[in-house]
Amino acid sequence: MKKRTQVSTIMTKDVITLNHKDNLETAELLFKKNNIRHIPVVNGEQIIGMLSYTDLLRISFADAVDEDEQDIDTIVYNMFTIEQVMAKNLISVEASSTIKDVAEILSKREFHALPVLNDGKLVGIVTTTDLINYLID
């Protein structure tokens, strides 16, 4: 049965991360360049938060301005740090967790992405899109 499959089979393994000291402009560039919507925030090797593209949109005009109008975003981004904007109360799953476990968490919580850990180390990220794509295959 599909729901007993481990999350490690559907997670993104090459995780793009942000350092907690990076700035929000760097975050926006990573979101757009890599066409992603969630980036784990780390301090050294420890994950301390998750920044979503939606978090950026809440404080800026990132989707509403042209590249020529970046000054607006720069001013807003300089008012906040990643740590002020990111989600801090994360729920993570182990790489050995089942897809059913992940589906239950995502369906009951307000998260759209979960960090995947192996012995406390970040080894992947799983999103609602990963889950849906797996289920429709």
Write out the residue ranges for each language-model feature.
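A glycine-centered beta-loop-beta connector
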Residues: 31, 39-55, 106, 114-129
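Residue-level signal for alpha-helical context at structural boundaries
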Residues: 25, 45, 74-75, 120
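The conserved cystathionine-beta-synthase
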Residues: 18-35, 42, 83-87, 92-110, ...
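Tandem CBS (Bateman) regulatory domains
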Residues: 1-14, 53-91, 98, 103-107, ...
